[in-house]
């Protein structure tokens, strides 16, 4: 008999979890509290149901070739970066293509998920749900929690003295949909993540003035890289990842700063990272121009509010503020879980490889999608789901809970003593994390073997963008179309741009430029790697670089 799996949520994580269950001959039942799939990608004009929804103007930050399910590429005529409606259409196409909708119970809320009395032997769960006021109870062999990390808005009013006496409008960006209601206003946006940048830019078109407050600053990246290619495809490459493992961290920071400041000097624009803070970046094509034109003014963090104004940490005061929009992120929660499991899952370090709670006697629960990646979360959740379903089926193993808890407890103690840094809330490096999960499944690409068997494919895998199709080339879940998808990924990237016929001379020039842009840097880096293959040589170079560069970094 097939094992029964409860999937909580039908967003990007839930949909791939349903499919992965079917791929492993498991029996999924998905519970979705709204009336449709897509989670936050399903746009609605209001958020009265308490669910997080996106704003109307949202555009994806990761290009289509880097943010698709690994065996279901976007249609070639889809734009590289798309509107929320286009992305939701893709999710609908995915669900229909793999016939996933029949496994979803809509307008159903999960009330509780508790261990069965014989959990230590069976790993089973009691799941109580509610549909139209009626409760139902069922037993499942495993549970996949796919509610994501955008559940509850984080509104830290207690951190802003005087905010309660402020007379203007106060809201979280979860409630923001369109800019029209702010026409002619002076608006203060607090927080500079991707949402903060987007909201500030959009408001600048109708508001009298937009003030953008940030504590730490940020690097601002454009969606188009050198030559106009999607930046994700240019920077997310295995060859570059190898180089990052070799070069000293101080040298990498220096290179990154130079690269980031090529487009514009972040310090001049008030965006440079506060000294001692972890570097972060946002994707925004228009923010620098808005700052340059004066429609957006960057400010330091807010010290306190009065009835009509905001006083900032640098002593400046902005009067007559009409609205304050907090873009301060979200707090994830698992209200349906029992204690102490609920509290443990709230600490990411207690999730083995960000998926399995460390304290469970049986690995029959997986938290899917609770990750921050320097890349597409969708592709990360798919690999998590592929791994989790194979663990449920007994095809993959994880260490016993005693070992996992001992390791985490030791790490927690070292963090408290200041011996090591807590990195559980930092964004994970994309390729290392994806490869780690793929190795657990048995789908990590074998680059040396590929160079022997299929040099053309190996070249694209190692020097080209690390697209999700790479994790379908071999092992469990192998997809026959993966090779072709990789070799044609640049064709699908350029297809939506080819809307005007150009002369043959221009085409040849563009083609040459394309190959120089795409392969020039990887070839140069490959040459460096070949020269530096001796570990002794690497050590000496690293020491010399450290000694020569460090004094300049200090200055």
Swiss-Prot record:
<feature type="binding site">
    <location>
        <begin position="40"/>
        <end position="41"/>
    </location>
    <ligand>
        <name>FAD</name>
    </ligand>
</feature>
<feature type="binding site">
    <location>
        <begin position="195"/>
        <end position="198"/>
    </location>
    <ligand>
        <name>NADP(+)</name>
    </ligand>
</feature>
<dbReference type="InterPro" id="IPR036188">
    <property type="entry name" value="FAD/NAD-bd_sf"/>
</dbReference>
<dbReference type="Pfam" id="PF00743">
    <property type="entry name" value="FMO-like"/>
</dbReference>
<keyword id="KW-1133">Transmembrane helix</keyword>
<dbReference type="GO" id="GO:0050660">
    <property type="term" value="F:flavin adenine dinucleotide binding"/>
</dbReference>
<keyword id="KW-0285">Flavoprotein</keyword>
<keyword id="KW-0256">Endoplasmic reticulum</keyword>
<feature type="binding site">
    <location>
        <begin position="60"/>
        <end position="61"/>
    </location>
    <ligand>
        <name>NADP(+)</name>
    </ligand>
</feature>
<comment type="similarity">
    <text>Belongs to the FMO family.</text>
</comment>
<keyword id="KW-0472">Membrane</keyword>
<keyword id="KW-0492">Microsome</keyword>
<comment type="function">
    <text>This protein is involved in the oxidative metabolism of a variety of xenobiotics such as drugs and pesticides.</text>
</comment>
<keyword id="KW-0560">Oxidoreductase</keyword>
<feature type="binding site">
    <location>
        <position position="32"/>
    </location>
    <ligand>
        <name>FAD</name>
    </ligand>
</feature>
<dbReference type="GO" id="GO:0004499">
    <property type="term" value="F:N,N-dimethylaniline monooxygenase activity"/>
</dbReference>
<dbReference type="InterPro" id="IPR020946">
    <property type="entry name" value="Flavin_mOase-like"/>
</dbReference>
<keyword id="KW-0503">Monooxygenase</keyword>
<dbReference type="InterPro" id="IPR000960">
    <property type="entry name" value="Flavin_mOase"/>
</dbReference>
<keyword id="KW-0812">Transmembrane</keyword>
<feature type="binding site">
    <location>
        <begin position="9"/>
        <end position="13"/>
    </location>
    <ligand>
        <name>FAD</name>
    </ligand>
</feature>
<dbReference type="GO" id="GO:0050661">
    <property type="term" value="F:NADP binding"/>
</dbReference>
<keyword id="KW-0521">NADP</keyword>
<dbReference type="InterPro" id="IPR002256">
    <property type="entry name" value="Flavin_mOase_4"/>
</dbReference>
<protein>
    <recommendedName>
        <fullName>Dimethylaniline monooxygenase [N-oxide-forming] 4</fullName>
        <ecNumber>1.14.13.8</ecNumber>
    </recommendedName>
</protein>
<feature type="transmembrane region" description="Helical">
    <location>
        <begin position="515"/>
        <end position="532"/>
    </location>
</feature>
<dbReference type="GO" id="GO:0005789">
    <property type="term" value="C:endoplasmic reticulum membrane"/>
</dbReference>
<dbReference type="InterPro" id="IPR050346">
    <property type="entry name" value="FMO-like"/>
</dbReference>
<keyword id="KW-0274">FAD</keyword>
